[in-house]
Regions:
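N-terminal presequence-like segments and the immediate start of the first folded domain
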Residues: 1-61, 65-78, 84-145
Length: 145
């Protein structure tokens, strides 16, 4: 039996402007969410916040908007990948924000954090996630709108 694949662009998240992509792709209970930069969806052309704490919060808030639009919950996250432009300077502060979004020590996703030399819009951080939901898998052929 072939699975249905759904592509999502959430109006509440920053619009894809630098490339063509879906905010998320869903198949068989899995949701792969495209990396999010710290862009304010209400003011997408505004300068990015300067500090890592504000940037990390914006990334996670954007991820939550996309996840919610696809009818998943952040608690369904099984994997997080983080790109930090200044690993040594930003790792600890980023982790404090991360801990606020993933606060149940019994349900922590797997995670990779990578130091990179540059990110789009000169952001300090970008985050992408993968989620899985048994309930969504059971209804995988029913599209969301």
């Amino acid at each position: 039996m072939s699975s249905t694949i759904f592509h999502t662009v959430a109006a509440a998240a920053p619009a894809p402007v630098s490339a063509r992509y879906s905010h998320a792709v869903e198949a068989d209970g899995w949701l792969h969410v495209t990396g999010q930069l710290p862009v304010d969806p209400e003011r997408p052309d505004a300068p990015l916040p300067g500090d890592i704490t504000a940037q990390a919060r914006l990334c996670f808030d954007n991820l939550k908007r996309i996840v919610s639009h696809a009818r998943y919950a952040l608690d369904d996250t099984v994997f997080v990948r983080i790109y930090l432009r200044d690993f040594d300077a930003d790792f600890a502060a980023f982790n404090r924000v991360y801990d606020a979004y993933f606060d149940d020590p019994q349900r922590l996703p797997s995670r990779t954090t990578v130091g990179v030399s540059r990110l789009g819009r000169d952001a300090r951080v970008e985050v992408d996630i993968v989620l899985f939901s048994r309930e969504k898998r059971a209804t995988a052929s029913q599209p969301h709108t």
